[in-house]
Amino acid sequence: MRSQQPQNPDLGMKMGKPAPPAGPLKITFGDKSAEWTAATLAALPHKTITVYNEHAKANQTYSGVELIDLLKPLGVPEKPHGKEFRLYLVAEGSDGYQVVYSIGEVTPDVHDGTAIVADALEGKPIGETGPLQLVLTGEKRPARWVHNLVAIRVRVAE
């Protein structure tokens, strides 16, 4: 008798569908929130990173604002410890695509990688996958980068 393989659940993944135009980036943590437009982000200090994009089979250079610099004003700890490691982020693109990150994955004090909200690719504004994109160095799968980034929600695991 052959055992049946369980069916994969519908994860609601919407990859490959066209994304509606991205609006401002809204970041929330508890009752605090902030909105960032491409123009307001452009006025902040930028960091440039080079990552290998498995889909493009090439290194790509992105420039943007370090994510932790956008989270700190909302009270997200820059150097988490103890119970603060219960924090996680849900990043969402304008097409509804979502990726979950632990606070440790996006905090330079914990992780060797860098997380940026990128607004430039190869020195030019990000095209159809922008205007904003969440990019992390050290990620082996670009599917964990969020294109057309419109929301980041910081939550606490129970």
Which residues make up each language-model segment?
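N-terminal intrinsically disordered, low-complexity segments enriched in P/E/S/T
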Residues: 1-158
